[in-house]
Structures are given as structure tokens and as C-alpha cells.
Amino acid sequence: MTHLLTVFLVALMGLPVAQALECHVCAYNGDNCFKPMRCPAMATYCMTTRTYFTPYRMKVRKSCVPSCFETVYDGYSKHASATSCCQYYLCNGAGFATPVTLALVPALLATFWSLL
């Protein structure tokens, strides 16, 4: 019995220790912000929320949260928000596409297609 207990304890010591999630946590008037922080144990998501005052002006807020619900900005409403969620190390660092960027995609594709 003690032999089995010893094997169990040795195997248990070999398991990786769970580490707290790290996210960028900040609030910024502009495109993006980066400030890494270790999240509390109860926080299992990194969240990025962009509140649009106009299609070109926004406030970015990044945080650690215990639960997260993703939303999409429609590109037209004032004071509307878009929220993205993720669950791995510093996953909320990169920005996501803004309505202005998305509007350029068809023009770039048309230009590329005309060159062929």
C-alpha cells in the first residue's frame, strides 16, 4: 500500500501547476493599449471592449473577467460597444478589425482583381 502511495505522490508532483491567466488590463482613448497583468483566480477570461463614439473614435478597455459575452459593433450606432473574449496568455493584446478597416477590404480585393 505504501508503495502505491509513493508512486501516486511522485506522479502528482510531475503534474504542471495551474497558473493564473494573464491579460492586458487598461483603458485607453484610441486604437489599442497594452499593460500585462496576472488575473485573480476567479477570472477565467481576458476581455476587450471597444466603445465607439463615432466610427473613427473609440475607447478601448481591456480586463480580466470571470465570465464574458461577445458582442459585435454594427458600424453605425453611436456609443455602441463591441466585446471580444479569450482564455489564453495575453490573448487580448492584438486589436480586432474596426469598421474602417472592414470597409477597405472590398476596395483592396477589387484592386487586386483588376491587376490579374
UniProtKB/Swiss-Prot annotation:
- The question of whether Cytoplasm is a record keyword is answered with no
Instruction: Keywords in alphabetical order, please.
Output: Cell membrane, Cell projection, Disulfide bond, Endoplasmic reticulum, Glycoprotein, GPI-anchor, Lipoprotein, Membrane, Signal
Tissue note:
Expressed in neurons of multiple regions in the CNS, including the cerebral cortex, thalamus, substantia nigra, cerebellum, amygdala and hippocampus. Also expressed in kidney, heart and thymus, but at lower levels than in the brain. Expressed in the primary visual cortex (V1) and the lateral geniculate nucleus (at protein level).
The protein's GO terms of the molecular function aspect are: acetylcholine receptor binding; acetylcholine receptor inhibitor activity; acetylcholine receptor regulator activity; ion channel inhibitor activity
User: Where in or outside the cell?
Assistant: Cell membrane; Cell projection, Dendrite; Endoplasmic reticulum
Q: GPI-anchor amidated asparagine lipidation sites on this chain?
A: 92
Give an example GO biological process.
regulation of neurotransmitter receptor activity
Q: Which SMART domains match?
A: LU (SM00134)
GO CC terms on record?
dendrite; endoplasmic reticulum; membrane; plasma membrane; side of membrane; synapse
Name the membrane topology term: Lipid-anchor; GPI-anchor
Q: Which InterPro entries match?
A: Ly-6/neurotoxin-like_GPI-ap, LY6_UPA_recep-like, Snake_toxin-like_sf, Toxin/TOLIP
Query: What does the subunit section of this Swiss-Prot or TrEMBL entry state?
Result: Interacts with nAChRs containing alpha-4:beta-2 (CHRNA4:CHRNB2) and alpha-7 (CHRNA7) subunits. Interacts with CHRNA4 probably in the endoplasmic reticulum prior to nAChR pentameric assembly. Interacts with KCNA2/Potassium voltage-gated channel subfamily A member 2.
Q: Which PANTHER family match?
A: LY-6_NEUROTOXIN-LIKE PROTEIN 1, UPAR/LY6 DOMAIN-CONTAINING PROTEIN
Q: What is this protein called?
A: Ly-6/neurotoxin-like protein 1
Q: Which organism is it from?
A: Mus musculus (Mouse)
Q: What is the lineage of its organism?
A: Eukaryota, Metazoa, Chordata, Craniata, Vertebrata
